[in-house]
């Protein structure tokens, strides 16, 4: 790839980055803020991504934008259709890009283009009420500014700059759909011809908000329902029925203590790296009216696994339920597909110059089957700009400085992997 083919992206970004040490901005604030974004291809691309709503199952428009942009940079771009595996008829697709005919590159860099609801419009904010500030402190707010359109934008420009400096760099880009609710995009890629055995890539770099640190590990996941079956009756004669809600409550109360119980006493598993497994009772519903003894009740529960497998945790849950119910099957855990869930994930952190942390959230990483060989292990890195603490919140936001630093961080990871 030639520098001219990139529409001078590298030169423009370098110029924008050089502004980092300029004097504080004073003047027409709104004009200054928009000028900062307009003058940077990176920030302009990020703005365009965020301005296009892409809540899970509705990623088509932002996907088309990313596809067109990558094509304009002389990359070979494929649209990997995943619609038949979804609950919506709207077209859904992953975007897979690479240089020339190098369809199976050495290094795969990936993130997701879907977001959680609701859509929050893009906006710019000075870091303080004062009109004087440094451009790198400018705050960019809106849904997806962090999770994960910041990673998408930084990955794209890190790849373009790398290819401008080294046209033979063997890099592939994957931007998938559905990470926030089902993992359908990564699962589809994982089961496709683009993920062969043995693997053609030797490194995968996952883009998620990590506060610009390398992640050593993140917790696994397990979701299930606790179900109680009772018998309906008039509330004036409750002894004629069996309240499913009353049966559910003591079991829920016990499950809620498992994260604090030591494993040897029936509690959830722990590890030195990730600490305690945690359990969250996220939703409870049951009954049809206040004057009817409820015949059915259930709770939706999520466990973040610090150790062991999902099956290990299922066993702990089953034993805990049986302890309270004395084996009464009118209250039971419903795990659905027992193949669902994921164990804790561990990543490589052997590139110098990064802080190393662990995180409690989940990613697409377990959905990508890594076909390690006896003589070659595929390395996995997890890195990205922004904080998970605001990623799904009303105040989701990132600074210009974080976004620009992420480009440099991804370039270092790519360079170390080539």
UniProtKB/Swiss-Prot annotation:
Active site: residue positions: 179 (proton acceptor)
Pfam family, one: M20_dimer
Enzyme Commission number(s) from the entry: 3.4.17.-
Glycosylated residue positions: 74, 168
Broad class of the protein's primary localization: secreted
Keywords annotated in UniProt: Glycoprotein, Hydrolase, Metal-binding, Protease, Secreted, Signal, Zinc
Cofactor annotation comment: Binds 2 Zn(2+) ions per subunit.
Location within or outside the cell: Secreted
One GO term of the biological process aspect: proteolysis
Binding site for Zn(2+) 2: 147
Signal peptide boundaries: 1-18
Entry-linked PANTHER family: ACETYLORNITHINE DEACETYLASE, PEPTIDASE M20 DIMERISATION DOMAIN-CONTAINING PROTEIN
Family membership: Belongs to the peptidase M20A family.
Protein name per its UniProtKB record: Probable carboxypeptidase AFLA_000940
Protein source organism: Aspergillus flavus (strain ATCC 200026 / FGSC A1120 / IAM 13836 / NRRL 3357 / JCM 12722 / SRRC 167)
């Amino acid at each position: 790839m030639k520098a001219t083919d990139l529409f001078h992206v590298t030169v423009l970004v370098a110029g924008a980055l050089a502004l980092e040490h300029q004097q504080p901005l004073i003047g027409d604030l709104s004009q200054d803020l928009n000028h900062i974004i307009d003058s940077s291809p990176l920030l302009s691309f990020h703005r365009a991504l965020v301005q296009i709503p892409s809540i899970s199952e509705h990623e088509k428009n932002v996907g088309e934008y990313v596809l067109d942009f990558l094509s304009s940079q002389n990359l070979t771009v494929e649209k990997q259709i995943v619609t038949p595996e979804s609950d919506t008829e709207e077209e859904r697709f992953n975007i897979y890009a690479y240089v020339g005919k190098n369809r199976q590159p050495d290094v795969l860099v990936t993130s997701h283009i879907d977001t959680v609801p609701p859509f929050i419009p893009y906006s710019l904010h000075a870091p303080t009420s004062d009109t004087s500030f440094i451009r790198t402190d400018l705050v960019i707010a809106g849904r997806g500014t962090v999770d994960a359109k910041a990673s998408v934008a930084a990955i794209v420009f890190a790849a373009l700059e790398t290819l401008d400096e080294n046209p033979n760099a063997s890099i592939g880009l994957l931007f998938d759909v559905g990470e926030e609710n089902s993992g359908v995009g990564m699962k589809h890629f994982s089961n496709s011809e683009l993920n062969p055995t043995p693997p053609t890539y030797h490194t995968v770099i996952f883009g998620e908000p990590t506060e610009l640190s390398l992640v050593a590990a993140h917790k696994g996941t397990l979701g299930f329902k606790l179900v109680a079956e009772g018998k309906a009756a008039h509330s004036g004669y409750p002894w004629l029925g069996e309240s499913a809600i009353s049966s559910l409550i003591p079991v829920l109360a016990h499950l809620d203590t498992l994260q604090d119980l030591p494993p040897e006493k029936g509690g959830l598993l722990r590890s030195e790296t990730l600490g305690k497994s945690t359990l969250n009772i996220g939703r409870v519903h049951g009954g049809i009216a206040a004057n009817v003894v409820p015949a059915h009740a259930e709770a939706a529960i999520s466990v973040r696994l610090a150790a062991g497998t999902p099956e290990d945790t299922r066993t702990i849950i089953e034993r805990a339920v049986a302890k309270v119910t004395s084996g009464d099957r009118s209250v039971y855990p419903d795990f659905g597909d027992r193949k669902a869930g994921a164990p804790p994930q561990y990543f490589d952190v052997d590139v110098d110059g990064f802080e190393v942390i662990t995180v409690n959230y989940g990613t697409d990483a377990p959905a990508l089957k890594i076909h390690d060989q006896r003589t070659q292990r595929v390395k996995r890195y997890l890195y990205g700009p922004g904080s998970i603490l605001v990623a799904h919140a009303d105040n989701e936001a990132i600074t210009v400085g974080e976004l620009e630093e992420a480009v440099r961080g991804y370039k270092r990871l790519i360079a170390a992997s080539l």
